[in-house]
A protein has these predicted regions:
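Generic alpha-helical structural signal
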Residues: 2-3, 83
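Conserved short strand/loop->alpha-helix "switch" segment adjacent to the catalytic nucleotide/phosphoryl-transfer site
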Residues: 3-27
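Conserved beta-strand-loop-beta-strand hairpin that lines the nucleotide-binding pocket
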Residues: 34-107
Length: 107
C-alpha cells in the first residue's frame, strides 16, 4: 500500500517531504482500519492544488479516537501520530481522513 501511495504521489508531483508524511499517514490509517475496522477497507488519496487528502473507510461505525498509549503499549499511537503530522484530521466513524498542505512547484 505504501509503495502504491508513494508512486501515485510522485506522479502527482507532491513534494517529497509532504509525500513522506502522507505515506506514513496511509500506513497508520490503513493499519488502524484493518485492526479495528470491519469489512472492506478503502483508501482514497486526493491531490488538489495545494492539499493532499487521505481518506480510509471501513464498516466500523465507531470513530477513531486519540488514545494515550503507555510506554510499554504495543498499540494506541497511530491516530496520535496522524494528529501530530497532518494539518487536519477527523473521523466520522466509517471514514477517517487527514489533510496535508503542499505548496508544489508548478509543473
Amino acid at each position: 500500500m505504501r509503495r502504491i501511495a508513494r508512486a501515485f504521489l510522485r506522479r502527482c508531483r507532491v513534494s517529497e517531504p509532504v509525500a513522506g508524511l502522507v505515506v506514513l499517514a496511509v500506513s497508520e490509517l490503513v493499519t488502524n482500519a484493518v485492526v479495528h475496522g470491519e469489512g472492506e477497507v478503502v483508501l482514497r488519496i486526493t491531490v488538489g492544488v495545494d492539499v493532499v487528502r487521505v481518506s480510509v473507510t471501513d464498516h466500523n461505525p465507531a470513530p477513531a479516537v486519540l488514545k494515550e498509549a503507555g510506554p510499554d503499549g504495543e498499540s494506541g499511537r497511530g491516530i496520535r501520530l496522524v494528529d501530530a503530522i497532518s494539518d487536519a484530521w477527523d473521523s466520522s466513524g466509517e471514514e477517517t481522513w487527514c489533510e496535508f498542505q503542499d505548496a508544489r512547484a508548478a509543473a
